[in-house]
Every structure is written in structure tokens, then in C-alpha cells.
Amino acid sequence: MVKLFIGNLPREATEQEIRSLFEQYGKVLECDIIKNYGFVHIEDKTAAEDAIRNLHHYKLHGVNINVEASKNKSKASTKLHVGNISPTCTNQELRAKFEEYGPVIECDIVKDYAFVHMERAEDAVEAIRGLDNTEFQGKRMHVQLSTSRLRTAPGMGDQSGCYRCGKEGHWSKECPVDRTGRVADFTEQYNEQYGAVRTPYTMGYGESMYYNDAYGALDYYKRYRVRSYEAVAAAAAASAYNYAEQTMSHLPQVQSSAVPSHLNSTSVDPYDRHLLQNSGSAATSAAMAAAASSSYYGRDRSPLRRNAAVLPAVGEGYGYGPESEMSQASAATRNSLYDMARYEREQYVDRTRYSAF
């Protein structure tokens, strides 16, 4: 079947008149007139070519009509989305799989999914029922109606039906709209061809002549702006000083008599040392120093020699009675706590040693 377009029809023309005119060259299946143009469907292609050759610019009711093959757009198809496709699958294999349910207009594989355009909607529904969640080349594929609004019509060889914006006249790689739906920025492409684009000079912060104007516009957000560390520290120190002045201003300034007069001055040297007052003569000081040195350095510091004097000799044993207790008590007072521990431990050792006698 071939569809012919008839243009520039006169108002007096009727469908019966147009049908009888084209039946001279072949069988007419359908004839429709829409205002000043119409369509005629001829069964044979050769008959359609003869009708075009003989009836183009044919004068009908004083008007030359135009007869040519119809250049209508592609038939509306049903677009299917096929997911989870094997990486080894080809377009021919996938097309053959879907042609089992009806004519396939186009089949395109994109990575692990594909789009299949079927000519009839009822065939697409049958393909979904028969192929969804089925094994194909070792993987379970998912078939469903495509929800993409762009590129619903088949045809990828010409500059028609851009994937991104849906307009005609360019491919998707040349589309000014990016993948997010915004107009793309061609600054980089322009810079490569014509050099870098100079941006206008903008004045820096505070360079305006009216910036420091005391009677300028009010800054309503000044209280919310972040201040520098130095300003915050200075404000904190000032507030602390003012608080001390307000709270302690009514208290009298009392100077304690116990504090020496040389410590009340503000110029006190913490490293200044003062000699103790001389309470006696030089002879007294020398005697005190000699006593201190004799009591500390003159004493025998060896615990072994001190314990040897206190412990009883071998074979004498331990005595009992008040005299022995007093001697042990006097020895304990002469020794330190460390010496007492050593003495008791050595006494226990000696006791075990002389227990057989």
C-alpha cells in the first residue's frame, strides 16, 4: 500500500470525484479530503507511480492540484525497556527474540540494557508477558514499558529527535542542554577558539568610597557577623575589668600588718633573697653547726654494723626477763623504722638458726 498526498484541492472537489480520478491507474483502498488537501491509498506501488506521473499539476475545476508520495512521520511505536542484558548479546539476537511477538522497528543496546521499538502496542504487551523475568543468554532480563519521554520515535541516523531536549536539527552530543536539563556553558569551547574571556574587574571588599561613610546605609546584620579573635579577647578583658571595678569599688583597701612592708610594693622581686637575722654570736652559730653535722654525718649509717651490735652472739641464745626486754626496747628506739624491719627479719632468721639448741 502506498499513501499519496493531494494538495491545492478546490472547494468543489469531492471524495467520489477524487477516487474515480485515481482509480484509472490502480485500486484505491481509501480516500480522504481534509479542507484543501487529501490522502489517497493505492494498493500497488506501480499504480501509485503512474498516478503521480499523470495527475501531478492536473487541472481540476480550474485549479492545478499537486500529487506526490506522502512524507508522513514514522508510525508511532511502543518503546520497551529491556534490562539486565548479557554483555555478549548483539542487536540482531535481541531483535530476533522480540520479533517472535511482532514486527520490530528498531533495537538499540546501551551497555547492559536496551530499547526495543515495536510496531504495534498489542505485540509489545505480549512481549512483556512472554519475556519479562525470563532467561536469555544466561541472564534473567526484565522487560517493561519505557518511561522515557524523549526519543519515543525510532530513527537514530539523522539529526532528528534529540535525546536531551527533544528538538530536531542536532544530535544529542551537540545539544546545548546538559544531562541535568540546564543550558550548557560554552565558555571553555569559546576560550579554545578565541582565547580566554576576560572577566570584568570588580572592586574588593571595602574599596568603595562610601564604605567608611559614617552616614551610609545601616548594617542590620552587624550583630550576627563573626568578630576576630583579637577583638573578642579585648572585649572579654574589658568586661572582666569593669566587673571587678563595679563589684569591689565599695570595699575599703585594708593592708594587713602581717605582710611585710617590702612585699606590699608593686616592684617585688620574686627571686630576691634576704639573710636571716643574727640572733647570737659567731661561737653559738658554730656550735649549732657542729652539733648538726655530728648528729647527721657522725652517726654510723650502716645497718649491718648497727644490727651486729644489737643481735646476741652465737651460742648465747635469747634471754628472758625484764633486763632483756629493756635492752630490746632501747635498741628499737635507737633504730629507725627501716632498721626495725631489718632487725625483726634478722631476728627471725637467727631464731630459726638457734631453734635446735
Curated annotation (Swiss-Prot):
Subcellular location: Nucleus, Nucleolus
UniProt keyword list: Activator, Metal-binding, mRNA processing, mRNA splicing, Nucleus, Repeat, RNA-binding, Zinc, Zinc-finger
Main location per the UniProt record: nucleus
UniProt zinc finger (CCHC-type) residues: 160-177
GO cellular component: cytosol; nucleolus; nucleoplasm; protein-containing complex
Tissue spec: Expressed in the suprachiasmatic nucleus (SCN) (at protein level). Expressed in the suprachiasmatic nucleus (SCN).
Top-level division of the source organism's lineage: Eukaryota
InterPro entries in UniProt: Euk_RNA-bind_prot (IPR050502), Nucleotide-bd_a/b_plait_sf (IPR012677), RBD_domain_sf (IPR035979), RBM4_RRM1 (IPR034897), RBM4_RRM2 (IPR034898), RRM_dom (IPR000504), Znf_CCHC (IPR001878)
Subunit structure, as described in the record: Interacts with TNPO3, which may mediate nuclear import of the protein.
Stated role: Required for the translational activation of PER1 mRNA in response to circadian clock. Binds directly to the 3'-UTR of the PER1 mRNA.
Name of protein: RNA-binding protein 4B
Organism annotation: Mus musculus
Native organism taxonomy: Eukaryota, Metazoa, Chordata, Craniata, Vertebrata
UniProt gene name: Rbm4b
